[in-house]
Amino acid sequence: MFIAHAAQARDRGAELYLVSVAKTAKGIREGNEHYPQVARTLGIPVLMANCVGPADTFIGAGGSAAWDSQGNLLAALDGPQEGIILLDTKNSSAVGVPLSMPSA
């Protein structure tokens, strides 16, 4: 995929690669293979934020995730669940916090 972009960011001093994506279920499967490799290869944590639900002509699959600098998965949100991932780069830990919508 796009490791050159991440490498350029790291070479310019980035200590975290933050990726905002709009991926389908297929794209998330590919991202879950690619981004841990980016983390391992470049030695920096990766935080991937995906959209959830209808987006233009497709359905965003959710599945936002964070990996440490060795490519270990630290946290991920389940599929189409809205939420936020809190990544602590100092302690190499993360937590996925689901968000629930208020009932109408």
PLM ranges: what are they?
Residues 1-42, 48:
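Active-site beta-loop-alpha substructure in enzyme catalytic cores
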